[in-house]
Regions:
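C-terminal lobe and pocket-closing loops
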Residues: 278-289, 303-409, 447
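A structural signal for short loop-to-beta-strand junctions that line the ligand-binding cleft
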Residues: 93-95, 124-159, 191, 304-307, ...
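Short, well-ordered beta-strand elements
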Residues: 38-51, 66-71, 95-96, 142
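Short, low-complexity disordered leader/linker segments with a strong preference
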Residues: 1-43, 427, 437-448
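Conserved C-terminal helix/tail region of periplasmic/extracytoplasmic solute-binding proteins
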Residues: 161, 245, 386-448
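Extracytoplasmic "Venus flytrap"/periplasmic binding protein-like
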Residues: 59-129, 162-164, 261-271, 426
Length: 448
C-alpha cells in the first residue's frame, strides 16, 4: 500500500480539482439530463452492489444516451480491495464507485475521489444531516448520498410481551439492561440481542454515546486516535461490558448467519440495534417472523433523543476518470434526480428530506421482499414514520478515521477475545488503539 504524505495528497487533490474544472468546461446540463456532448463519453463503468441501481442505470441510459456498465465486484471491503488494486496499478478503476460513508475519508485524503464541492452548492437542504455530513471531508464534498442508516431499535414484540416488557418505554440503557434480564429469564437460550464483535456496531454505539475518538486535521496530515480516554467510548463499553459479564448477550451467533436470522424468527434473538435499511433484510431472510416485529427509537445512555448512523453509502466519481462529465451526470441522476424515487420505490431507505417527509413513504406498512411481494412484517405499523424520525435525530459531528477501512478490518484481531470472555473490552480497545496509532504513523500521518 502506498504511504500517505501531505505532498502526495496535495498533488492528488490538485489533479482532482483540475479534473473538476474539465467537468465544468464540458458545459452539459445535468439538471435536464441532456446527453454529454463529448463523443468519446458514451459509456461509463460503475462499481456498486446496491440492487436498485440496476433500474436506475437503465432509466439513465434511456434519458441521456450514456451507457452504464454496472458491475458488482463485491460488497464493501471486497469492492475496496479491488478498488485499491486498480488505483495502485494505475488502470482498471471504474468511473463511479459505491463508497460507504465510513470509507469516504480514506479515499478522499489520498486524492482518489473527485472533489465535487462547487457542483453541490445548496445540496445540504436536499439531504438529511447525517448522510450529507458523511460525504464531506476537510470541508470538501466527495460524493452524493445514496441511502442512509439511522440507528433504530427493532424488536420481536411477541417475545417482549411474553417477558412483560414494553419496548416502546425503553428510553435509557439502564432500562434496556433491565429488559435484557427479563428476556434471558425466559430461557437460557433467549437473549435481547447478539454481538460477536462488530466494528461498525461499535462505531455506531460509541457515536450514540457522544464519543469523538477520531479526529483529522483540516489538511489531513494529523490524526488523533483517543479511544481509551474518550468519555463516550467509556460510557458505551461500561454498559456493554455489564451485559457481557452477566451473560445477557448472545456472543456465539455470528451476525448475518443462517442461525442469526433463525434466532429472529424463533425469538431467541429478541431485538437488534441496527440501521434503517434492515426491514427488507428481515422480510427476506427472517420471513417467518412477519407480524411479530416492530421498531422504535434507540434508547440512549441518558434518555435523550440523539441518534447515530449505521451503514449507508454514496456514489462517488473517481479522480482518475476520463469521463468526469458523464460520471457526474450519473451520480446526479441517481442520487439527486429521478433515480431517487426509483430507488425508494425499490425498497431503499432514502437519504433525502423530500422522500423521508412524503406521506407515501411515512404511511407505508408493508415491506417488499425479493419477489416483489408486499409483506406485513411489522404488524401494520407505519415503520417508516419511526425511521424518518430516527434520521432527523442523527448527530452529524462524528468523524471516521482516514483509514477506517483498515481499522474495521483489524477490529476483531484485538477485540475478538472481549466477546468470548477472555479479556475485558477495555483491554481490547487499548490494543486496538495502539495498532491504529502505529498504522497511522506507518502511513505517514502525524498521530496523537
Amino acid at each position: 500500500m502506498m504511504k500517505f504524505t501531505v505532498a502526495k495528497k496535495a498533488i492528488a487533490l490538485t489533479g482532482a480539482v483540475a479534473m473538476l474544472g474539465s467537468v465544468a468546461a464540458c458545459g452539459s446540463d445535468t439538471a435536464s439530463g441532456k446527453p454529454a456532448q463529448d463523443k468519446d463519453v458514451t459509456e461509463i463503468t460503475v462499481w456498486a452492489w446496491e440492487p436498485t441501481l440496476t433500474q436506475v442505470a437503465k432509466d439513465f441510459t434511456k434519458k441521456t444516451g450514456i451507457k452504464v456498465d454496472l458491475k458488482n465486484v463485491g460488497t464493501n471491503t471486497k469492492e475496496y480491495t479491488q478498488l485499491d488494486n486498480a488505483i495502485e496499478a494505475g488502470s482498471g478503476a471504474p468511473d463511479v464507485a459505491q463508497v460507504e460513508y465510513y470509507a469516504i475519508p480514506q479515499y478522499a485524503i489520498k486524492g482518489n475521489l473527485l472533489d465535487i464541492t462547487d457542483k453541490t452548492s445548496g445540496y445540504s437542504d436536499f439531504y438529511t444531516p447525517g448522510p450529507w455530513a458523511s460525504v464531506q471531508f476537510a470541508g470538501k464534498v466527495y460524493g452524493l448520498p445514496m441511502d442512509s442508516g439511522p440507528m433504530a431499535f427493532f424488536y420481536n414484540k411477541e417475545v417482549f410481551d411474553k417477558a412483560g416488557v414494553d419496548a416502546e418505554q425503553i428510553k435509557t440503557w439502564d432500562q434496556y439492561y433491565d429488559a435484557a434480564k427479563k428476556i434471558h429469564a425466559l430461557g437460557d437460550n433467549y437473549y435481547i440481542t447478539s454481538d460477536t464483535g462488530d466494528a461498525g456496531f461499535f462505531d455506531s454505539m460509541t457515536w450514540l454515546a457522544g464519543a469523538k475518538p477520531f479526529q483529522t486535521s483540516s489538511d489531513g496530515s494529523e490524526v488523533t486516535v483517543n479511544l481509551t480516554e474518550d468519555k463516550g467510548v467509556k460510557t458505551f463499553t461500561d454498559f456493554w461490558q455489564k451485559l457481557l459479564d452477566e451473560g445477557l448477550l448472545d456472543t456465539k451467533t455470528a451476525g448475518w448467519s443462517e442461525d442469526w436470522f433463525k434466532g429472529m424468527v424463533d425469538g431467541t434473538i429478541a431485538s437488534l440495534f441496527t440501521g434503517a435499511w434492515m426491514p427488507a433484510n428481515l422480510a427476506n431472510s427472517a420471513a417467518d417472523g412477519a407480524g411479530k416485529w416492530r421498531v422504535t427509537q434507540m434508547p440512549t445512555a441518558d434518555g435523550s433523543t440523539t441518534n447515530s448512523e449505521n451503514g449507508g453509502s454514496s456514489l462517488a466519481v473517481l479522480a482518475s476518470t476520463k469521463k468526469a462529465d458523464a460520471a457526474y451526470q450519473f451520480i446526479e441522476y441517481a442520487n439527486h434526480g429521478d433515480g431517487v424515487a426509483t430507488r425508494v420505490a425499490g425498497g431503499a431507505f432514502p437519504a433525502d428530506k423530500a422522500s423521508m417527509e412524503s406521506d407515501s413513504f411515512k404511511n407505508t406498512t408493508t415491506v417488499k421482499n425479493a419477489d416483489g411481494e408486499d409483506v406485513d412484517y411489522f404488524g401494520g405499523q407505519k415503520y417508516n414514520e419511526v425511521l424518518a424520525q430516527a434520521a432527523e435525530n442523527v448527530s452529524s459531528d462524528y468523524q471516521f478515521l482516514p483509514y477506517e477501512v483498515k481499522a474495521r478490518t483489524i477490529f476483531g484481531d484485538y477485540l475478538g477475545k472481549s466477546y468470548t470472555g477472555d479479556q475485558k473490552l477495555t483491554d481490547g480497545i487499548a490494543a486496538w488503539q495502539k495498532a491504529l496509532q502505529d498504522y497511522g504513523k506507518d502511513q505517514g500521518f502525524t498521530v496523537k
